[in-house]
Every structure is written in C-alpha cells, then in structure tokens.
Amino acid sequence: VSKKRSFLLMRRSFKMQKKDFFLCGFTGWCLEIFWTGLHSLFTGNFTMMGKTSLLMFPVYGLAALIRPAYRKLKGFPVMVRGIFYSCGIFFVEFLIGSFFQKLHICPWDYSHVPLQYKGVIRLDYAPLWFLTGLFFEWLLRQNPRKVS
C-alpha cells in the first residue's frame, strides 16, 4: 500500500469515526433527555421536563468506540457483549466523572443513592448500561462504515 493510499484511507477512516462520534453524541443527549423526563414523571412532575448538559455530548460521543469493539466481539453471545459494554460504560463514567469532580463541573452526583461509588457511578444502572451499550451497537450497525 502506497503512502498516499495509506494517508487517504486513514483520512477517510477519521471522517467516518467523526460521523459515529456525532451520531452517538446526539443520540446520547436525546436518551438522557428522555430518561430524565421519565424520571420527572415518576417523581410526580407531570411536565416531564428532561435535561442534559453540554458537557455530556463528548462523553456520549465516546460510544463510537463500540463499533471497533463490536468488530472484535461479534462472534460472542449478546450477553457477553452487553456485559462488556456495561463494564466499559462504567469505566468511562468513573474516569470522566472523577475528572469532572476535580474540576467541580460534574453534571451528575449519585452520592445520595445507596448503590453508588464515589458519587460518580451507580451500580444499579448496570442493566441500563447493558441495554444502552447494545442499543449503541445496533445503532452503529445500522450505519455501516467501510474503508476500502
């Protein structure tokens, strides 16, 4: 493969990853607004007001990493992939949440709930992250990217 062809492939791959990043970022924002709106309803607020933070866009954009992970995991059962994704989401949530806490800009605080760790992750969200990871896998598979 010539250097020029390698460069063009790398550039094309970067553009595709950027599209995945934006797709996942916008989708994550929408999911969070929907989730917080439902939570608002269940706590008696019938306006069903949902919310998110601008800081969350790049965090959700990282779900684009599921595409390369899926390429390695596609031979595994859905349960294994879901567990892998939920562990990955917990890991990213912990790292980014801890970083945001140090800067005093963390948009979430789980310190008031029982199954939390350091206020940045909720262990009772494991089933939610399992399903969310599989949802992002499905979403990214609906938008195939090929590098040739």
Q: Model-flagged regions — what are they?
A:
Residues 3-5:
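Polybasic, lysine-rich low-complexity intrinsically disordered segments
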Residues 9-148:
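Aromatic-rich, lipid-facing transmembrane alpha helices and their immediate juxtamembrane interface loops
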